[in-house]
């Protein structure tokens, strides 16, 4: 189960980056 925590945190970071990039794109458009 040691792999569970890193994967969850990685998914959270990925979602944050995606939403951040989407917000930037919406602002510029």
UniProtKB/Swiss-Prot annotation:
An individual GO BP term: pyrroloquinoline quinone biosynthetic process
Pathway annotation: Cofactor biosynthesis; pyrroloquinoline quinone biosynthesis
Chain residue numbers at which the record places covalent cross-link Pyrroloquinoline quinone (Glu-Tyr): 16-20
Domain of life: Bacteria
Keywords per UniProt: PQQ biosynthesis
UniProt record similarity statement: Belongs to the PqqA family.
HAMAP family in UniProt: PQQ_syn_PqqA (MF_00656)
Function text: Required for coenzyme pyrroloquinoline quinone (PQQ) biosynthesis. PQQ is probably formed by cross-linking a specific glutamate to a specific tyrosine residue and excising these residues from the peptide. There seems to be another source for PQQ in this bacteria only.
Protein name: Coenzyme PQQ synthesis protein A
Species of origin: Methylorubrum extorquens (strain ATCC 14718 / DSM 1338 / JCM 2805 / NCIMB 9133 / AM1) (Methylobacterium extorquens)
């Amino acid at each position: 189960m040691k792999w569970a925590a890193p994967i969850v945190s990685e998914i959270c970071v990925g979602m944050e980056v995606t939403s951040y990039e989407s917000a930037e794109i919406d602002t510029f458009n």
